[in-house]
Design a protein with these regions (language model features):
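Structural preference for solvent-exposed beta-strand-turn elements
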Residues: 1-151
Length: 151
């Protein structure tokens, strides 16, 4: 077996990604976690994508919205604590944002609508317990408080 060493380095350039809600969630989050300015083209502003944009903004990320692209300043992410994260009805936003909200020490309150609160979050609760992360939730509605930092 050959060992491969990966060295972190600053990337620049353009990546063409087809319009996709699934990829857009990931691109917004990755750009928000990058330590620089990113542009994401071909954005379609569905309700789920808008929920992810607002969720990252609630962590402090500066995001400028234009007709079909975003400018995201990842250097501002995690500048806010006591985050209120409204996932609307987006399961993707919820599942991505729970761990991202506590990469740094934070108090995060997740809310949402529709059937979002009925989705199982037991995997997260098990991780919270193993890592001594405080959490409080209500059954059948999305009203989740998380306090701490992932290890």
């Amino acid at each position: 077996m050959t060992a491969v060493k990966i060295t972190p380095t600053k990337l620049s350039g353009v990546v063409q990604v087809p319009p996709s809600k699934s990829l857009a969630h990931r691109a917004i989050i990755c750009a928000s976690l990058a330590k620089g300015i990113s542009r994401i083209d071909n954005i379609e502003y569905s309700k789920d994508i808008q929920a992810t944009i607002k969720a990252m903004q609630s962590l402090g990320t500066k995001i400028e919205k234009y007709d079909d692209y975003l400018i995201i300043d990842g250097t501002t992410t995690y500048t806010k604590q006591n985050s209120e994260i409204d996932c609307e009805e987006s399961g993707s936003t919820l599942r991505f944002m729970v761990p991202i909200a506590i990469v740094e020490e934070n108090k995060a309150h997740f809310v949402g609508r529709g059937n979002l609160g009925k989705r199982p979050l037991n995997t997260f609760y098990e991780i919270f317990e193993r890592q001594n992360i405080g959490y409080l939730y209500k059954e059948d509605i999305l009203d989740l408080y998380v306090i701490g930092k992932l290890k």
